[in-house]
Amino acid sequence: MPNLEKEFHNGVNGLNGNTKIENDGCVNPHSLGIIGGGWYGCHIAATLLALGFRVKLFEQHERLLHEASGNNQFRLHMGFHYARHSGTRLQSRDGFLRFVEHYPELSRIVPYNIYAVPTQDSLLDYNTYKAIMASSGVAFTEGAPDGVHITNVDGIMCVPERVLLLTKARAYFEAALKGALELGRKVSSIQEADDGVLIDGEGFDFVVDATWGHYMDLDLQVIYEATLLLYYEGPPEFPAVTLVDGPLASVYPTEVPGVFTLSSVPHTPLGQFKTAAEARAARDGVSPATISAKRALMEEQIMHYLPTFLETFRYIGPQLAVKTKPLGAYDDRSCRVSRRGRMFSVMSGKIDTIFFAHERILSLIDDES
């Protein structure tokens, strides 16, 4: 069997800078069922479909990118968040460049994108943080734009990270996966057979679980975290402001001009749980009183660095989600693909490592052949 990843990079799939996937007419003998229509499920399905695989994507909701993929800060990372984990930084840096190349219409530039290191509250001083980023090969400039008032920080840099465009992404993947999508379809059973895997009785050569442990258990220790972000309305030209490194906060724009999210490392979590079901119950059962209390804490925290925050922004409402995170204090959000028989499980902390995931799956299928 030919090397599938080599064919992919040589362009037989037509994936290029115009955000276009075309099938070259060559049919691959393998079929894959993919569970979960988030960023990873959609990208893996579209890539394999373009390579000639027979693919079906199962998503329990009526639209794609409905769960954690559509409820986050919508940041396309370059690695600046991860001063304490080199593997995550390098995957983010490389994944960012590939994402912009392959999906140029699914993100946009954030004109003023600030990372600031607090004087007292950061786990790293500014010069150490700067040295780590410089050695990682990511671009940045030092100093804040004119007119931005940030207090209690040791140093500031501006970075070229982007914001994801969720509405365009949904439309794009729905078109790219036309005929291969099962929306509103919750998978009831997966059974291994002698020569494949059955999803609700339908046969596939391989199955990819892209639900982050919401369907099948993962092969590493994780926790499921119910989360709360807050939406605010503010000046469209206001910069993104991210405080690093440690238990800090950030203000980041969304795809809608003038709408931002506020996130806080200590206050965004609603609780950590051993099972996805427990985390979903906590998310769905959060009370208005809890949201109000969390909002007060998050606003107090961000105003230590942006003292005019409440004068500049108006609260709109909450964003609720469940995240899957590996256990450990070392800040690992790198991408992993594990295999049990003919079933693959994907686990990653960030959108920018989607390319690593599909490459690893192709490699494992090649090994099987």
Curated annotation (Swiss-Prot):
GO terms for molecular function: monooxygenase activity. Pathway: Secondary metabolite biosynthesis. SUPFAM superfamilies: FAD/NAD(P)-binding domain. Its cofactor is FAD. Gene3D superfamilies: FAD/NAD(P)-binding domain (3.50.50.60). Pfam families: NAD_binding_8 (PF13450). Keywords: FAD, Flavoprotein, Monooxygenase, Oxidoreductase. It is an enzyme of class 1 (oxidoreductase). Its EC number is 1.14.13.-. Induction: Expression is induced in the presence of 6mM glutamine. Belongs to the aromatic-ring hydroxylase family. FAD-dependent monooxygenase; part of the gene cluster that mediates the biosynthesis of the gamma-pyrones fusapyrone (FPY) and deoxyfusapyrone (dFPY). FPY is an undecaketide and thus likely synthesized by the polyketide synthase FPY1 from acetyl-CoA functioning as starter unit and the addition of 10 malonyl-CoA extender units by successive Claisen-condensations. This is FAD-dependent monooxygenase FPY4. It comes from Fusarium mangiferae (Mango malformation disease fungus).
